[in-house]
Amino acid sequence: MAMTILHASEKVNAEAEATTCPPTEKVKEEQQQQEQLQHSKTSKRVQFYRFALFFIAGSFAAFSFHALTSSSSWRLRQLHHLPNAHYLQTREEFAVYSVEELNAFKEFYDKSISDSVGASYSEAEQTNIKEALGALRLAQDMHLSGKDDKASRLFEHALALAPKHPEVLLRYGEFLEHNQRNIVLADQYYFQALTLCPSNSEALANRQRTAEVVQTLDERRLQSLDSKRDALSAIHESSSALRRAKKEAYFQHIYHSVGIEGNTMTLAQTRSILETRMAVDGKSIDEHNEILGMDLAMKYINASLVQKLEITIKDILELHRRVLGHVDPIEGGEFRRNQVYVGGHVPPGPGDLALLMQRFERWLNSEHSSSLHPVNYAAYAHYKLVHIHPFIDGNGRTSRLLMNTLLMRAGYPPVIIPKQQRSKYYHFLKLANEGDIRPFVRFIADCTEKTLDLYLWATSDLPQQIPMLIQTESEAGEQLAQMRSPHISAQSASIPEFYEFSGSGFQP
């Protein structure tokens, strides 16, 4: 009996020990598999909830963005920095944009143009249009009678009264093309008529006839500039005449560039400030500082920017920082933070500047841009930057400096826009805003040619000294009339003629 009880107790103890001993490896694996299965189910459930949440949020964002971009106000905000009918410009202008962007631009501007054409005129505008159309009919009668001088004056009067009327532009263009042999200006008026009324079949037919001829003339002009550039490049840098010309032109560049912005310093006073750093009596501190800022910017170009393969936003900011370095050090090198208005042009808002400047930088360094003729490239860059108007002040000076930087990199001397030509300068910029940048490019080409003529004349064997600049408007008009021919010889021109259209020099 005792033996039986003992065995029973041993059996109980063995079962107890069996229940308290650790599990075997097989049990452990089963437990781990169950835990992993449970974790996998939980993880999949969480992932599903996350995906559903992101899908709902993404769908809502896409719907909101579509609704926003479909509104006309959003399109206006994104596209108002471009001029009306910009899609009609030369194909070099939009080659860096995608097909979708081009279609968006065209759709937007087609609507804006049709709206502007169909807009109601004020009573005064209607009166001017009626008078302009009357003058137009009378001009055509005078032309048929053989009185072309009177007809020309009547056409000009009609254009002054209604400069944006397609019929006036069309008929005056035909008169210029067939009677005055001015096919370039005629093509410009046909272009404007099409910009205002794209469905005008007569303007379209005329434009198709003149466009190729005008393009050929422009290309020949650029080839002529290249020939003069090569002739200047053949002159050795050690030439004393070339060094004198560079030094004199350097003073004139600063004088003209600040003069366009309203600075009243004379050329002699500008030269004195740069050479002596002494103040001029009767002139404001800002006028002194504008000259010193241009001097700093031009030295920066000569020392650094000309040698760079690519020009970045940082380089443009550094250039602007020097332009305003003495006038407004706080705003120098900074994008504006407020909306500005420049005559009838409304530049983009400050919130759009970063994106637009990034696009401008991308265009500036693109392969397409580098394939353009240097004069076209420089003129486009000048216009694009001044149109964006990224700074509170100094946009014009910075744009002209950038233009000259690009020209100098291509072997051209830096050119000047004479202060006497200020009204033409702004007029051609206005035409570019309205859709045709070609007149502005031709204006820059004119300035480039006069600069080249200046250097070629100054380095010739003629005994005269480098002349002083003509500064009066009447003298400028007289010299302009004498230099209408684009192929005038440098050796045959008179001394003042060159300096009326002279370009800037770089620091020797």
From Swiss-Prot:
Binding-site residues, ATP: 261, 342-345, 393-400, 425-426, 433
Residues annotated as site: Important for autoinhibition of adenylyltransferase activity: 261
Domain called Fido: residue spans: 311-446
InterPro entries in UniProt: Fido (IPR003812), Fido-like_dom_sf (IPR036597), Fido_containing (IPR040198), TPR-like_helical_dom_sf (IPR011990)
Subunit structure: Homodimer.
Family that this chain belongs to: Belongs to the fic family.
Protein name: Protein adenylyltransferase Fic
